[in-house]
Structure formats: C-alpha cells, structure tokens
Amino acid sequence: MNEDAPMDLVDDRFADQSIQDEPVDDGESFYNEDVYVDCEEDEDDDVVPTSENFRLENRYKPSLHTPRELPTIREENREDVRSNTSSRVNTRPPSVLSDKSNDISNMFGFQDGGRAIDQYTDQFYSEGNRAERLFPEAGFLQNSPVRDKQNSWEPSVCHYEKQPTPEVKNNSPGLVFANMSSKKDVTRKQENVRPGKMMPEKVNDENEPKSRRFSPERNTFTTSPMNSTKYLEEKTSTPKRPGGTNRLGTRGLPSFECSTIYDISPQRTSGTPKTYESRHPTNAYTPNSATTSDTVLSNRTIGDNTVQNVLKGVDINLLTALENARKKRDRPQVKPDFRLNSLPRGKLSSTQRPKSDDHSSMTSIVSSSTQNNTGYRKIQEQRNSATSTDLTNSNTSNFTNNTSRVSTAKNDFSRSSRQRNGFSDSSVSTIIPNMNSMTTRDRDGRDSVSSVRTISRASSTMTVGGGNGHMTSGAPKPLRFHVSRLGFGYVPIGETLTMQLEVENTTDRPCKVNARLDSKITCFKVLDNATTMIDPKKAIKVRVAFTPTSLGRYSLYLKAEVAEQNFTQKIPVWGWGGVSKIAPISARNLQPTSNSSEFAMFVSDMKRIAFKLGNSGDRSGFALLTVYDSAMRQVPNSYVRFNPSNGIVIGKNYEKLIEIRIDPSYHDHYGELTNNRTSSAMSTVSTASSMASLRRRVIAGSDFFVQVAWGVEGIRERLRMLEMKHKRRQMIDGLDFTSHPFTDEKCVVYPPPDAYPTISDEDHDLFAASYSNFYINIFSSPDGLNAFRAATVSADKFDNDATVLETSAFRHQTFVNDVTMVPRHTKLM
C-alpha cells in the first residue's frame, strides 16, 4: 500500500471495522481518563493537562515495570488487526506538539527526560534482567511473567524499522545489533558536525509516515529480520499515551542504530553483566576499532549495501553472517597459554648439542665417519704429545687440577698403580704445585722400584669434567654442569671413591645452591655443605663419595636446586659394588717384589714362558697381555704367540694357564741390546716408553717383560657396545681391548636394560680410569734375577721417593716431575 494515500480512502475501505481498545478500569492502570483526548472527535483541541494534585507518591508510580492488566493484541488475532491499521491513524495539529503543558516530565519535577531515560536504561540492563539481548523474540524479556506477550505494554510483535542504515565509520564498534545511544551520544554527534554544515532538525511529527518515523518503544525491542520478512509489516499496539510519550512520560528513549551488530549499550558506564560477558567473547577481529571490553562477538562490520540487499530479498549473505555469528557465540573461547616453553622439547640430536671450549673432544659426537677418524687421530696425537705446551693446550689437561696429590704411604704395597683393592685410610697425601709437569703416552708405564705410586682410583679425589649437560628447554639455566652424569664404575666393596662435580653460576647474581641426594642410600654421600653460595660467573666443586657395602648396582640422582629461581637440575649418579682382582699365582720361578705391580720370573728356556693368572675378586675380569723387550719395544705378533690368546676372560675364583712363545730369531733381527744399557740420570721424561726405558737403565735386568692390563669384564662390555654404536675402534692408551676376540668372552653383547645407564662417550673415560696393569719381568739367568731383587731392596731402603709421580687418578694423564734421582748403587754393568 502506498503510505501517502488519502486518509478518506482508507476510511472508506475500513469503515465497517473497528477495534475496541478502551482502557480497563483498573486502579493500577496507567490510563488516565482526565487527560485522555480523543483525537478523532476533536482534532483541534489541545490535550487537557494533568491535574496539579497528581503527585509521584499518589496513584501514578513510575516503578519502571510494565503494567500487567492492560489488554494487548494476542498473537492469534494479529492477522485481523493488520487490516484495521489505517482506522487508528490519528492526526494532531502542530500546536499540540509545541504546547509544553503536556510535557509530563515537568509535572513530575524533572528538568528534562534524561534522568528517566538513564533510570530506565539502568533498570533494563540491571543484574536482575539477565535477558537474551541478542534476539529478544526468544529471550527472557518476552517470556517472563511480567513481560510476556499477554500482559506487556510493548507491541505483541516487534517491528523492524525500514529506516536507512546510518553510515558505518571505521571507528564504530565491531558488529553490534542493539547499539543503544542516549542523549550524551546525540550531543557527541552534534559536536562532530562540521562547522559549515547545518545539523538537520528533527521534528516529532505524528503525521510523518510510519516507515520513516522514529518509534523509541519499538526500537527498544527490535527483532532481527533473519527469520522472515513478516516483521516489516506494521503492527498495532495498546492505546497510545498522550503527547506521544512513553510510560515514564519522556520522549527520548534510546534510539536504535543499525550500524553495528551485537554490542552492549555504550551508555553503560558500570560493568557489563557477568552472564552477558560469559556469553559474548571479546572481539578478536577488530582490535583497532573503538570496540572495548563490551564487544560481544568477533564479526566484521556488514556494509549498507549488504543490509539493503537482504531487506529487498536480493541477497541472503546477511542471514548467513548472522547464523555464523550465532554459532560462534556458543563456541568456547580458547584461553591463552602464558607458560614458557609450553611444548616440551625432545632430546637434542647429536648435531644440536651445545658446544663448549672445555668440552673434551673425546666426549663429543661427530656426525660423519671421516670426522670421527680425524678426531680420533687428533686425540691420540694430543695424548701422545711429549711437550708441556701440548699438555697445556690439550683438552684432557682440563681434567687435572693445578695441584696434584703425592702419596707418601711407605708400607702400602698391596695396591698396584691402578689397583683399587687394599686402600687404607692411613695413607698421607700432600698437595704440591704441578709446575714443570710433562704428559706421558702410556697411562701407567712402569713404576720405580724405590717408590710405590699409591694413588689409586678408590683412594683419590676425582675431578669430573666434560661436556655441558643437555639443555632440555630454551630458557637459560642459572647453573651449568660440566657433566651430564656421575659414573663411579666398579668400586671394591668397603672402599671409598670420591668424585668432584663442577657447578658454575652463569648468572650475574649470586646463587644459593642446595645439593642433596634423592635417596636415603648410605652408600652415597655428599661431603660438602648441603647449601652453598656461588658467586656470579664462578664455579664450585661438589664432592660425592661412593662406598659400596655389598655386591650390586647402585643408582640415584643428585639434585642441585636454586630455590630463588625455581630451578632444579638432576644429575644421575651410579656405580657398582665389587671388582675383579687378577694377579699371577706365585710359583717357584715366579715371585713378587716390594712393588705390587712388579713380579720377577726366571725362565731357562725363552722359547716357552708359562705362568698362571687367577681372579680372586667378586666379578669376572679380563686380561690383555703384551710382550716388550729390554729396550721397551713391543715384540711384533709375527715373533710371539699366546696360548690360548693374548686376551682372556677369567671368572671369579678361577685360574688360567698362559703360555707365551717367543721366536729365537727375534734377537738376531733386532740385535743384542743388553750390553748397551746405561745408567745415565733422567733429565726429562716425556713418554711412558722413555720412563720405562729409564727404569730399565736404573734396574739392571730382564730380557723381556710382559705387561698385563686387567679389569672388570662388565666395563669392557660397555666399551664394546660403545664401539658398535660409533662404529670405530676404541683405543685406550695405545691398547686395543675390543677389535679382537677374547677367550671365553660373550659372543654377542646386547644394549643394557632401561634401568641401567645408557652407553655414552663417558664409558670410554670410565674404562681408561678403571683398568689396571702389572708387569712380569722375565730373566734368562739367575744373576739377572738376583740383581733385580737386590736393586729392589736397596731402592726401597735408601730412596723411597726417588721418583715423584703425579696423576689425576680419573683421566688419561700421568705426570712425572723432573726431580728423579738415580741411586749410584744401581749401576751394575
């Protein structure tokens, strides 16, 4: 229908129809007969003002609640009502609008209607009205007993205005549908008008077509057009109030804007209702807009063209957008995770491990086989270096302290230089500066007759060095550990082995470190203070002692905690109780000497050398035999044969017969060297071979001697597994313990169980620190044997400390200071 059609034509069309909309006689009704004006009978008369005796405390009480008993148009009759819309069109002269006598706000003592608007708005958004403001037709406001469709002052069906959508600005809140603006917003809009542009005047004329006329009451509960287009039709309601006012007597209820969708009213200066905030997450798509915490949905602004196309039925994109918005509203909001390193890292690969200058090249993992072989050769060169410069620059020198221990125990002859059995607490150790020390190629060499090196692995303090502990997270750690674990290896039952763990403070402030063990096992003990302070960029050493009480495996964790920084580092600590003890069985032709690592044997026929080796320890052990001549040259394999082999495995409490046959042509090939021996004093010692050669000059003696390197078979099996892991030969002090089979060894070795320590480069160093040596001197004449015995007794009687030996006791180096004095009586030839 054309809205500009003459009203008489409308009256002719619907003359026979009318609506009985007289007010109900109710004491609580808002309808007032005295002030009601029938505009159809007398259109020119002014509205009769309300009596002066009409007060706020009397019958009319603006309680901000809608009346209950006023009749409204029911849902089932709205089709009939639509046909009678034109019969209720009322026209009022402009004089009535200009007459301020009907301004109900002045009657109630209000200066303006703003306070009533604010009261109504606050009541509408109060905590008690937890209504669904997104779609009011399905919300709590329409279904409550006070505001249901049967007892509501509001229209039974809400209208959707056909007014043009205001311009959407860039700074407008993101996509709101119920943006309520008060007089403050209107004032703000007027201030934003350009100076040269006139503000259009808004005239409240009831003769204006309803499609363009502003209706505050209907706009308050405007319904979304997403369900159907029937809401665009005009609806009738209960009788109008005088003067076009609302139930509070004011004209300026909050206006309705279509610029945005789903936004809470900006009039709200107080907090948003909790239920409203929980249903509507914060806008995440328009963070730079004017949307504050009141933004309820994360949608983009819908343009004017899209809205017009939807209203005209051309496009349904808006319907789809509204449906998606409704689905997103029910979707739970993902909470941000502010934890550091929320994704745990796995173990670093071999190529990603952190590097360090003081990290031992022996413990570094090389990716390619070519680099492995090159690195191995470099290690051997550094180990065999003969100068003090090489010693200072070598990686292995970092494992020794600036001071070394020199044992002065005179009566402790039960231990060999590498033997841990027979350790006594009566040993006296003295700290001396390590000044002009030289490195040696051989780990043990052969000890002096006049001095017994009593520094064994079980009786010494070990300084553990090596690579950094693996970093499991990207966050910097306040402490830096030079090893990832403490491996004590095999320790004799009842003996004590002490190791030092270096801990460095990497921060710029002091750290209070608490070191403790996570188990109550008495075998392990932290010797230092449990709590200590570490200065910035400084390091301390934590001593841990291991004393096994029975045969078995022990493992626990050493925890280093920095409570102020909530940091805890665990260092695995493990060790075995019980060792093997291999030694030659004394016979008539084989006798021990005052040095526990030296034995003398008389053999009339050098073609066959036979002796027995026995294992009196608690575990199976291995023995590797090597034959040297009097000039400390190793006899080639083509001139010597071993029966059963040069490598054997001996079980505990078991003996094995060893036969060595030397080809007589060996002397013809290399010449007789016994007449070339000298008694010159030692001025510089650089290698184990030269040191042994010096002792051969000092101690007149043997034609050959046999070096027996022995240890626990379990630690050699770990070395074999390390060799299979890296696929390269593991040489220990120039000796090969793994490339050839040993007699009675296991044919196949398997990786250790999960509860056991994993195979790592530390096993190489652990093996080098744990195996021991002893020597059997072979004499072809009784005179040589007697001279050897006399030299041994004289050296022990006159010069017990003739040679001062220093060792790190855990790593690869043996140092000899240039203080050796050669007794004059040792020269026999």
Curated annotation (Swiss-Prot):
Please state where this protein is localized.
Cytoplasm, Cytoskeleton, Microtubule organizing center, Centrosome, Centriole
Q: Name one Pfam family in it.
A: Cep192_D4
Which InterPro entries does the annotation name? Cep192_Spd-2-like_dom, Ig-like_fold, Spd-2/CEP192
Where composition is biased (Polar residues), the residues are 83-93, 217-230, 266-294, 409-439, 448-463
Swiss-Prot/TrEMBL GO biological process terms:
centriole replication; centrosome-templated microtubule nucleation; embryo development ending in birth or egg hatching; protein localization to centrosome; vulval development
Coiled coil spans = 314-332
> How is this protein annotated for GO cellular component?
centriole; cytoplasm; pericentriolar material
Q: Name one GO molecular function term.
A: molecular adaptor activity
Keyword Ribonucleoprotein in the entry? The reply is: no
**Principal subcellular localisation of the protein:** cytoplasm
Cite the residue spans of the region called Disordered.
1-29, 41-104, 183-294, 326-471
Which residues lie in Low complexity bias regions? Answer: 361-370, 384-408
- Which keywords accompany this UniProt record? Cell cycle, Coiled coil, Cytoplasm, Cytoskeleton, Developmental protein
Superkingdom is Eukaryota
Residue spans of biased composition, Basic and acidic residues class: 54-82, 183-216
Q: Which PANTHER family match?
A: CENTROSOMAL PROTEIN OF 192 KDA (PTHR16029:SF11)
- Per its database record, what is this protein's job? Required both for centrosome duplication and maturation. Required for pericentriolar material (PCM) recruitment.
Q: What is the protein's name according to its record?
A: Spindle-defective protein 2
